[in-house]
């Protein structure tokens, strides 16, 4: 919600490969209401939303942002089985792209102005990170915020020695004050800037603060957030973000400068914004000719967008940003050259699928070897962490099974022998990676052994070096025992 008197913040939802939507929405705000971005108290984001916030605060140009996102999509779609190919490593690509694109002083530019949503592995609680001491910490926080368990890998990355996963697991639309935060999401739901659905269905579901309207459109968007569609579809989503943001500005009445729409001539425009093909366009040009000038890769993009928007939003198509349309047009082009065109021929594609049972094992072996080589420096810590998590799981399972087995015992046996010998109870005391608890006494009862073990693993005080290692929330121990 926008509140000019109390100030405002912006929150960008986690949306995977649909981050193009945030680019379009932010471009509209920067053109029609630049004060919303310039004077915002903080920018919040989870996963792809956090990446976008860092890009905005770092001043990364629009063209470079679209290029990075497009390269990620091309990388994910370059194989026959897409993201499921063993060679696709999302975290590795993100880390390399961030180290390349972010400026050296990015930690100074964003500290105190951003809130990156992280999910702590130890207790599943949400953590908002705002202050950074170096560029490496910014990269680590972003990689943690984008790490989807089992999708990005098995071992979560760490930030300042603590393991974190995707912030969307605990809070996908982070904010501090809901009344003064403008929320942005590419999903149909209850947000300030989001698509509007052509339906009378008002059923919603909330998942980690992600409000989703129950409709087929959201099912499609959720699937495309993990499995990227064609770049033309993502270009349409980017333009959709621009239109939804403009509708929000119109509803709030906070547009404060003329629209740089497609009907405008190139006179008085920035040289990098003006397109050569629009130089001969006059102010009297019809909406059809204006739309024709910015159709990307033919007529598919805008025509498909016109079919998917609401009737009263068609007039907003004339306000689309020329610079955004130009940048999208460049990224939609096939950059593979003749070799890419040859590989996209139908006979070649059929042959590649036929040969997949032969080529996939070889490619998988190569990808596994490469991952093992890059994993060698972190292997000792990660193996110890896996052992620690395994012991946690074993302890929880044991604790859940013990009450059931005790309840099945005869009443007479329970009254006759309140303390059963240790060897009659399958209890195992796991050890942490960097230290073991004190040796238990042989004459201790099973309940005391179990309580001691659980207090060690589930207590408020975690051993040094084991922060962020538990994968389950803690609970009251006395009630269970």
Swiss-Prot record:
Residues 63-481 are lumenal. Its EC number is 2.3.1.51, 3.1.1.4, 3.1.1.3. It is found in: Membrane; Lipid droplet. The chain crosses the membrane at residues 42-62. GO terms for cellular component: cytoplasm; endoplasmic reticulum membrane; lipid droplet; membrane. A motif (GXGXXG) lies at residues 14-19. Changing residue 104 to V: In NAFLD1; uncertain significance. This is 1-acylglycerol-3-phosphate O-acyltransferase PNPLA3. It comes from Homo sapiens (Human).
């Amino acid at each position: 919600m926008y509140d000019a008197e109390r100030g405002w913040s912006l929150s960008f939802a986690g949306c995977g490969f649909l981050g193009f939507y945030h680019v379009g929405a932010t471009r509209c705000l920067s053109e029609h209401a630049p004060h919303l971005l310039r004077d915002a108290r903080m920018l919040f984001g989870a996963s792809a939303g956090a990446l976008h916030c860092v890009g905005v605060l770092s001043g990364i140009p629009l063209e470079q942002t679209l290029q990075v996102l497009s390269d990620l999509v091309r990388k994910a779609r370059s194989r026959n089985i897409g993201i499921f190919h063993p060679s696709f490593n999302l975290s590795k690509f993100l880390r390399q792209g961030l180290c390349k694109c972010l400026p050296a002083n990015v930690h100074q530019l964003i500290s105190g102005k951003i809130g990156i949503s992280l999910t702590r592995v130890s207790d599943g609680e949400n953590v908002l990170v705002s202050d950074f001491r170096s560029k490496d910490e910014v990269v680590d926080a972003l990689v943690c915020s984008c790490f989807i368990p089992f999708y990005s890998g098995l071992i979560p990355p760490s930030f300042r020695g603590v393991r974190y996963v995707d912030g969307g697991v605990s809070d996908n639309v982070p904010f501090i004050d809901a009344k003064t935060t403008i929320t942005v999401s590419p999903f149909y739901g209850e947000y300030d800037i989001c698509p509007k659905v052509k339906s009378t269905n008002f059923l919603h579901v909330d998942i980690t603060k992600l409000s989703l309207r129950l409709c087929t459109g959201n099912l499609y968007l959720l699937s495309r957030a993990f499995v990227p569609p064609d770049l033309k579809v993502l270009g349409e989503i980017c333009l959709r973000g621009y239109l939804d943001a403009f509708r929000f500005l119109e509803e709030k009445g906070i547009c404060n400068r003329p629209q740089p729409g497609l009907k405008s001539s190139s006179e008085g425009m920035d040289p990098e914004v003006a397109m050569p093909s629009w130089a001969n366009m006059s102010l009297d040009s019809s909406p059809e000719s204006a739309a024709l000038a910015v159709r990307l890769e033919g007529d598919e993009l805008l025509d498909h967008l016109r079919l998917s928007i609401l009737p009263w939003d068609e007039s907003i198509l004339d306000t689309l940003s020329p610079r955004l349309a130009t940048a999208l047009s460049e990224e939609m082009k096939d950059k593979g050259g003749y070799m890419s065109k040859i590989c996209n021929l139908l006979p070649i594609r059929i042959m590649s699928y036929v040969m997949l049972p032969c080529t996939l094992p070889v490619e998988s072996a190569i990808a596994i070897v490469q991952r093992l080589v890059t994993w060698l420096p972190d292997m000792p810590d990660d193996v110890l962490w896996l052992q620690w998590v395994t012991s946690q799981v074993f302890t929880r399972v044991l604790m859940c099974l013990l009450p059931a087995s005790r309840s099945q015992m005869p009443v007479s046996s329970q009254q006759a022998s309140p303390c059963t010998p240790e060897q009659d109870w399958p209890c195992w005391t796991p050890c942490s990676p960097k230290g073991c608890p004190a040796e238990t006494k042989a004459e201790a009862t099973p309940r005391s052994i179990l309580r001691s073990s659980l207090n060690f693993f589930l207590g408020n005080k975690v051993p040094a070096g084991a922060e962020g290692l538990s994968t389950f929330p803690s609970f009251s121990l006395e009630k269970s025992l």
